[in-house]
């Protein structure tokens, strides 16, 4: 019983940390710039809750301007529908990094390791 209580407290704490307010960068409006280039970075659209591509003309950007999708997703993970967090299967994501993470295996009642690729997934 004591182990179950520890696991429950750990997940409650984890959920609070991971679902806190988004980084303030994520609420900045996209800035298309004021030069003549045609670049296609990503920005976090706080209305849709997703990272999206846009045309940036260069010069005059803010911090909500990411060269790569994974940078945007890492900084601004978006709105998560957590549902029952403890019953989620691990999803390693679509990138190729190698981060050891943990998930709660509802069948065994234990936390187990899995490899997270760095973007996407359900961490």
UniProtKB/Swiss-Prot annotation:
InterPro entries documented for this protein: Kunitz_BPTI, Kunitz_BPTI_sf, Prtase_inh_Kunz-CS, TFPI/VKTCI-like
Which parts of the sequence belong to the BPTI/Kunitz inhibitor domain? Answer: 26-76, 86-123
- Report which superkingdom the organism of origin falls in: Eukaryota
Q: Name one Pfam family in it.
A: Kunitz_BPTI
Q: Where would you find this protein in the cell?
A: Secreted
Per the UniProt entry, the signal peptide is 1-20
One BP annotation, GO: envenomation resulting in negative regulation of voltage-gated potassium channel activity in another organism
Cellular component GO terms held in the UniProt record: extracellular space
The family database entries (SMART domains) matched by this protein are listed as: KU
Q: List the disulfide bonds.
A: 26-76, 35-59, 51-72, 86-111, 95-119
Q: Which UniProt keywords apply?
A: Disulfide bond, Ion channel impairing toxin, Potassium channel impairing toxin, Protease inhibitor, Repeat, Secreted, Serine protease inhibitor, Signal, Toxin, Voltage-gated potassium channel impairing toxin
Q: Which family does it belong to?
A: Belongs to the venom Kunitz-type family. 02 (native) subfamily.
This chain's function reads: Dual-function toxin that inhibits both serine proteases and voltage-gated potassium channels (Kv).
Q: What is this protein called?
A: U13-hexatoxin-Hi1a
Annotated source species:
Hadronyche infensa (Fraser island funnel-web spider)
């Amino acid at each position: 019983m004591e182990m179950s209580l520890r696991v429950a407290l750990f997940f409650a704490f984890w959920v609070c940390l991971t679902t806190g307010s988004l980084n303030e960068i994520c609420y900045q409006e996209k800035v298309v710039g004021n030069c003549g280039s045609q670049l296609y970075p990503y920005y976090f659209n706080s209305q849709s809750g997703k990272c999206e591509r846009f045309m940036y003309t260069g010069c005059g950007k803010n911090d909500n301007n990411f060269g790569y999708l994974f940078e945007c997703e890492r900084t601004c993970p978006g709105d998560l529908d957590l549902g029952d967090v403890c019953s989620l299967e691990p999803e390693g994501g679509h990138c190729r990094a190698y981060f050891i993470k943990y998930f709660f295996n509802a069948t065994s009642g234990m936390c187990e390791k899995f490899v997270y690729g760095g973007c996407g997934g359900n961490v």
